[in-house]
């Protein structure tokens, strides 16, 4: 058992990033860079682009990308769902107001809990993005 764990630890070298399926890579790049302030690292239109902030890499895969091809059983990868990237922000209420003024769609109202405040917005393809402001400690 110990050897299996060690082999698995050597097999996984680290976290590369998070992949989102998108319908229009150019539109998604504009959303993540202009609305959320991520950096554009790589862009190979129309197939894919990579944006980042800190150690987070977000890979935006368009319909023509190798990371978007159907599975062997015919199941198609599609945008949307509930799994999401969580981006830490300061002054969440202020950021919400700014984004609402530019027409960004939110799935819910800001929630406040013991760990902080959060809200879900959608990118142009319906992929959820959570904005999170940790509670003061």
Whereabouts are the PLM-identified features?
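Short glycine-/small-residue motifs
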Residues: 128-131
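Conserved active-site tyrosine of GNAT-family acetyltransferases
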Residues: 28, 32-33, 99, 126
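Vicinal oxygen chelate
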Residues: 1-16, 39-87, 96-122, 133-137
